[in-house]
Amino acid sequence: GFPSSQTFIEIKTAETALAVHDGADECDCVLNVGAFLSGDYETCADEIEEIKAACADNPLKVILETGALKSAINIKRAAILAMYAGADFIKTSTGKIEVAATLEAAYVMCTAIKEYYDLTGTFIGFKAAGGIKTTAEAIDFYTVVREILGEDYIKQGLFRIGTSRLANLLVSDILGEDVKPF
């Protein structure tokens, strides 16, 4: 169902189970934004639960596609729904729509993660993805996570930045010269 989540749940679960069978050690799914924006939260939660079951013991990242959700309240509701339905990580974006990862979305999602942790004692990971192109932008997301969720979140198991360009930029910024090792 990537990137739009617009396929049947049977296809989504079959794809997930096949990926796990073929060796995937993590699974991603995209929130059914159409159902969510229509107020059909039950369908959204049911889909996440079924995909989580197909993941076996592997972590599930639920992509909220925050740019399509359009408001802080929708982002928070989607984050809470995803966590209670079984997400191990919540992720900002597929990177396939114009508005991808934003600091506002990161702030709202991290606040929801903190509230969820305070209520349940369960750590949920956060991944900023889509449109992060510079070291400075990555540092901004790092700062949001550190300030809201604390130092315990600044590790691979709980915080990630997804980008196709950033690794080379970071190495170049550290070394002070243009390099392309990745």
Outline where the language-model segments fall.
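Alpha/beta enzyme core
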Residues: G1-F126, K133-S164, N168, S172-F182
